[in-house]
Amino acid sequence: MPRMQTPRITIWNEYIHERESAAVAAIYPRGLHRTLADALGRQPGLTVRTATLDEPDQGLPPAVLDATDVLVWWGHAAHEAVKDELAARVQERVIAGMGLVVLHSGHESKIFKRLMGTSCHLCWREAGERERVWVINPGHPIAAGLGDCIELEHSEMYGEPFGIPTPDELIFISWFEGGEVFRGGCTWTRGSGRIFYFSPGHETYPIYHHPDIQRVITNGVLWARPQGRPAQVPRHVPVEQARQPIVARGASVHDQAGKLASRHA
């Protein structure tokens, strides 16, 4: 995955609710992926494209993934419709250095669960209650430009316990009007790839139109972009290429090229 001076962002959205629910379509008439693309497009130095589940190869053929430095993922109604092969390809790209920003209900996506290795389950309630997203790591780049918290008048409650591995960094904790709290902004590294999960974003509320939410996602994309050189694939180093002269000793089940010798030889 080549590194570019201009980060290439792909926003993937299953794009189902906007076409099946009048309430969601009224908020995101062109799809929430277009709202996010418009917001990211205002950030100088980003190249932004969108992809949806109904496109060929579910929107992410190998050529698109190869041309993506950070993938933004939103899914809810069609987690199981995402092909296992696609989830595996995304996982491979992340481990090789592609950044991943997972939003809201994407915590149940195949790709997020693969990378976390845990259930990723949580508690939830859809009641349009107030959410206060507290910035608990104000010095982190993802929190740049924010105040003490983000106030959302209407939101879906996500609550603990949240079945994720301990985050490398915890940036936001949400409080909800009903009393619950939630680790709503977390980061991890998998291989050479950076991952940011951000919980606000229920589809029936205009959360992705909120300037501070857009700022967090933009900051998250900038933070998650590839760092340095990509991870190298495993490779065999022949004896004659050792940095210091050595002599091979003992038996081996590999041939001189490093491949397993035939079991039937």
Report the location of each language-model feature.
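Extracellular ligand-binding/catalytic regions of CAZymes and related secreted enzymes
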Residues: 2-6, 126, 190-265
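Short glycine-rich His-centered loop
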Residues: 5-27
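Short hydrophobic segments within beta-strands
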Residues: 12-14, 103, 198
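Cell-envelope and extracellular/periplasmic
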Residues: 14-15, 74-76, 201, 225
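Short, solvent-exposed loop/turn elements at domain surfaces
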Residues: 17-21, 180, 206-207
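Helical hinge/lid and interdomain linker segments adjacent to catalytic or ligand-binding clefts
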Residues: 25-109
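Catalytic beta-strand/loop cores that center a nucleophilic Ser/Cys/Thr
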Residues: 46-49, 122-199, 234, 248-253, ...
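A glycine-rich, often tryptophan-bearing local segment used as a flexible ligand/cofactor-contacting loop or short
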Residues: 78-146
